[in-house]
Design a protein with these regions (language model features):
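Short amphipathic coiled-coil heptad-repeat segments
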Residues: 54-102, 113, 302-311
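Sequence-specific dsDNA recognition surfaces
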Residues: 129-134, 149-168, 181-210, 265
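Short, surface-exposed loop/turn microsegments at beta-strand edges and helix-strand junctions
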Residues: 7-9, 23-26, 166-175, 187-196, ...
Length: 311
């Protein structure tokens, strides 16, 4: 056993010049190896000590691997935990003087009726009531569950011409065209773009205003960010605009980040991995009072940069 442990170490110093491509030792180099030879009783003590220490080395290596994995995952896991606390009403305290989500919801419905009457939005088909089976977690009593389409405009991007990458849409372009990769890389706010439409491209698309929440529904499922400028995007991206100033788009952007895993699972149940508007419009979403939405956003914008600094 002494030789079993010592030979791999000693063989490093063998002459491997004549070995096959340097990957193996030849007979001559092995036979010429110099090996330190202690007395037999000492060999046995050396082997015993090695066999005592090697399991500790293995345990240390396993512990180090777990620690490296923990350090690698910790910033993202911490971010997910903070967002989950936010959307469950655990990040900031509830204040009775800020009213209830039910009161806010009634304001939203009044605003929708006004916009419908003015012809600015179309009347939607009634959505089904949210059932207990649809509720993924508990929320504070002052909050309520709603469907996204009940509290804002939810629509797919538009790119009518095929193929979507037709150069005729982009040559000499000057208007931002956002794609799924831009949303994925944005880290919350889309401040840059890589592609631009020309006038023909814009004409066959739709312009979304700055402040729109962008959600990817194909390729990278469930990535979310807010537009910092007016832009077009294709039908692989959904735009959501809560009825402002009654609601905070920033709150819904952070809230939708928590739904990435849920949306990804939903997308796998389809023939092609994507999410459609019908699925999104049915999702149950927690709604806090507006003042609490703003306090949640302010707290998140304090904490999330700290997670980024840990990376």
């Amino acid at each position: 056993m002494y030789l079993f442990y010592i030979l791999p170490f000693i063989s490093q110093f063998g002459e491997s010049k004549n070995a096959i491509k340097g990957k193996t030792l030849n007979d001559a180099s092995i036979s010429n190896l110099l090996i330190p030879l202690p007395p037999l009783s000492e060999q046995k003590r050396i082997v015993a000590k090695i066999e005592e220490l090697l399991p500790l080395v293995d345990r240390y290596e396993a512990a180090w691997t777990r620690l490296e994995d923990f350090n690698r995952r910790f910033p993202e896991d911490m971010k997910k935990s903070i967002l989950q606390h936010a959307i469950q009403g655990k990040l900031v305290e509830q204040r009775p003087e800020e009213g209830t989500a039910q009161e806010l919801y009634e304001q939203i419905q009044a605003e929708k009726r006004r916009l419908i009457k003015e012809g600015k939005i179309k009347k939607e088909k009634p959505l089904p009531e949210i059932t207990e089976d649809e509720i993924p977690f508990e929320i504070p009593e002052s909050w309520m569950w709603v469907r996204l389409q009940q509290i804002g405009e939810l629509s797919r991007g538009r790119s009518q011409k095929r193929p979507r990458n037709d150069p005729a849409l982009f040559t000499n372009g000057t208007f931002p065209f956002i794609q799924t990769g831009d949303v994925a890389r944005a880290n919350g706010h889309i401040a840059h773009w890589t592609t631009m439409y020309n006038q023909e491209g814009v004409a066959q698309s739709r312009i979304w205003p700055a402040g729109t929440v962008c959600l990817t529904i194909a390729a990278n499922i469930g990535d979310v960010a807010i537009l910092d400028f007016d832009a077009c995007f294709p039908d692989s991206v959904v735009g959501f605009n809560a009825y402002r100033p009654i609601l905070s788009n920033e709150f819904f952007m952070y809230g939708l980040m928590c739904y990435k895993t849920i949306l990804d699972k939903m997308s796998r149940s389809t023939a092609q991995k994507n999410i459609n508007i019908d699925i999104l419009s049915q999702i149950a979403f927690p709604l806090p009072p507006l003042a609490e939405q703003k306090r949640i956003v302010a707290r998140l914008e304090e904490l999330l940069p700290l997670c980024e600094r840990l990376k």
